[in-house]
Curated annotation (Swiss-Prot):
Organism: Gallus gallus
Protein name: Protein S100-A6
High-level lineage: Eukaryota, Metazoa, Chordata, Craniata, Vertebrata
Biological process annotations from GO: positive regulation of cell division
Calcium as UniProt keyword: yes
Lineage: superkingdom: Eukaryota
Molecular functions (GO terms): calcium ion binding; calcium-dependent protein binding; enzyme binding; protein homodimerization activity; S100 protein binding; tropomyosin binding; zinc ion binding
InterPro entries assigned: EF-hand-dom_pair, EF_Hand_1_Ca_BS, EF_hand_dom, S-100A6, S100/CaBP7/8-like_CS, S100_Ca-bd_sub
Gene: S100A6
Keyword Secreted among UniProt keywords: no
Boundaries of every EF-hand domain copy: 12-47, 48-83
Length: 92
């Protein structure tokens, strides 16, 4: 049986691949795929406006190829983890 952290990492990877490749490159997320992932997988997702998601896409797309590759996705997850950690510290 996999350890909890192994399971969590596996879920993060599987979530990327669940949404990537529907509109093109199977190893990256288009703007539409990123939007769908955010809206379906994050609690805050449905509350975000299209302009906010577009801004997030622009921030994440470091190589400016109009897609979010796995490395850019992991950067996004790291930023989210930092936000979640700050929220947790406030409630301790």
């Amino acid at each position: 049986m996999a350890a909890p952290l192994d399971q969590a990492i596996g879920l993060l990877v599987a979530t990327f691949h669940k949404y990537s490749g529907k509109e093109g490159d199977k190893n990256s997320l288009s703007k539409g795929e990123l939007k769908e992932l955010i809206q379906k997988e994050l609690t805050i997702g449905p509350k975000l406006k299209d302009a906010e998601i577009a801004g997030l896409m622009e921030d994440l797309d470091r190589n400016k190829d109009q897609e979010v590759n796995f490395q850019e996705y992991v950067t996004f997850l790291g930023a989210l983890a930092m936000i979640y950690n700050e929220a947790l510290l406030q409630y301790k």
